[in-house]
Amino acid sequence: MPASKPLLIALLGPTASGKTCLALQLAEQLKLSVLNVDSRQLYIGMDVGTAKPTKEQQRRVQHHLIDLRRPDQPITLQEFQAAAQLILAQKLREQNMPFLVGGSGLYLKALTCGLRPPAVPPQPELRKQLGELGQRTCHHLLQAADPTAANRISPADAMRTQRGLEVVYATGKPITTQQGSSPPPWRVLELGLDPHNLRERIGHRTTQLYANGLIEETEHLSHCYDTDLPLLQTIGYGEALKVIQGLLNREQAIALTTRRTQQFAKRQRTWFRRQHHPYWLKGEEPLSEALSLIQAGLR
């Protein structure tokens, strides 16, 4: 890896793979701050359901790109990229190594590969109309307008489905034909976590999310915002909302959240395999393995 450009580290992997724990260890060892690349952790008040780093963890290690907006104020990929690039530029000026951590593949790629997403601002009135149509209809519309995007986006992902339609209706072109790229001014070392016992880890974490107050957090969010809010239909929040509405009991919600999370993790694995080329940390000591790779990358 030529050392002509500064080094950026990215720690990626599917949900529940242990990224937060390893990120804290690496950040403390190397005296780094963390740039969040989890799309739901960008929103204020969505703490339990996104497994956002706790206040104590954020005191231990500085975190950026967390709690940027309220859940009813969507952040586009371009807006995220612009906010992240300001912090990255600051880190590079200070000669601090940027450290990205997260599992939102497209957001990671926007920073590591220099994607240029279309500059289409959110369209609140259109999103309201799409919300009234329902996610099933919206995904069918996206399938007709931009099959490539529809095949990449889960039929349950209302936020990304609406964004895809928003771009089509605003520009007359599919979003997938408008995403150019330009090489970023840094080298990238991608480290990947994908433990063999991921299914068990997902089951344990889902149970823990409910024990930590996911239903109560969802109830609070549903009082603050419309229950049709796309973020309240995402994994965990959607099932917790059904408990509040009397459509599921707690055990059913945990089982459904676990299943949806496992399906999501499978899609994440596919994305990382096709779109990224990380060094997969396979040993029993991921911290020491990661430190060795970082030291080698700095030479």
Swiss-Prot record:
Residues binding ATP: 13-20
Summarize where substrate binds, as residue positions: 15-20
Reactions that this protein is recorded to catalyse: adenosine(37) in tRNA + dimethylallyl diphosphate = N(6)-dimethylallyladenosine(37) in tRNA + diphosphate
Where does the chain cross the membrane? none
Secreted recorded as keyword: no
Q: What is its EC number?
A: 2.5.1.75
Which controlled-vocabulary keywords does the entry list? ATP-binding, Magnesium, Nucleotide-binding, Transferase, tRNA processing
Q: Where is this region: Interaction with substrate tRNA?
A: 38-41
Top-level taxon of the source organism: Bacteria
Q: Per the UniProt entry, what are the Gene Ontology biological process annotations, in alphabetical order? A: tRNA modification
Site (Interaction with substrate tRNA) at: 104
Q: Which family does it belong to?
A: Belongs to the IPP transferase family.
Q: What is this protein called?
A: tRNA dimethylallyltransferase
- Organism equals Prochlorococcus marinus (strain MIT 9313)
Encoding gene per record? miaA
